[in-house]
Amino acid sequence: MDKIQKDINEALETGRRFNILKMFSVAPLFSFMIILGTYYPINLFRMASEAGRDPAVPLTSMVTQLTSVENSLIPPNSFFGFLFLFCWFCYICFYVISKRNRIKTYLLTQVLQLILFIIFYYSWFVAILYLIPLVAIRIVYWIGFVLSLIYLVYILVTKQSASKDYFSSEYYKKFLNVILFLWLLMYGINLFTNGLNHFLAYLLLALLPISPIFLGLFLVSFFKSNVVTLENLNAVNKNQEKYREEYGYTIEEWYGKKSKMYKEHVKKSKKR
């Protein structure tokens, strides 16, 4: 089974699973989980930062204050409420579209998935900045974040597929020294500012500030692997009959019983 047929099978199976019950039960729950995963990290660390250092609350001793510029880049709470409604509205639209075009439905879900993943990436990126006390390092991370987004645009424009694995041994050695240096730097800062108390805890906490590097690499790899799927689905969506006949799908399997194409096919069959 080639990649195109695999994407077609996933698209048709996803289209078959769309129903009215899921639109009012699973879709809101899924949207809520997305909001929880994007809203909670930022606000947890922001509240701890605004509370100041309180010995009774361990988290307050781990976070730092962001600059006014960084705070202005944090989306307001209303954004996450809008995102919840937007996701729910999108899935309702996908349900309607799935009744006549399953391929397009799956294509749109993949696009929405990428958008949500970028928002998730940004949310966790900002949250982790609260664990980085040095402004200079945060500036470097901000530059890296912007460059990663520019690279994503480059991937879309050039239609670059996942031809390179950033976690292979070739790239592993290049990033290992950088990651090790940053980890030791963060660990040294924690020891200098907090002393030798909770030695193991600060050893593990030193890993958190370098996690944006792993987030960025994972995002790029995930994005590149999905570019091929988006290209395949877009090509199939533009020439559905060609691919349906080429891969041997029936009209019912491809469009569904409630589709206009299937109903017209049944009418023509009865006239014969």
Q: What is the predicted role of each segment?
A:
Residues 25-43, 86, 113-125, 177-190:
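Canonical alpha-helical transmembrane segments of integral membrane proteins
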Residues 27, 70-86, 137-148, 174-177, ...:
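Alpha-helical transmembrane segments of polytopic membrane proteins
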Residues 88-108, 154-172, 227-234:
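Cytoplasmic membrane-interface regions of multi-pass membrane proteins
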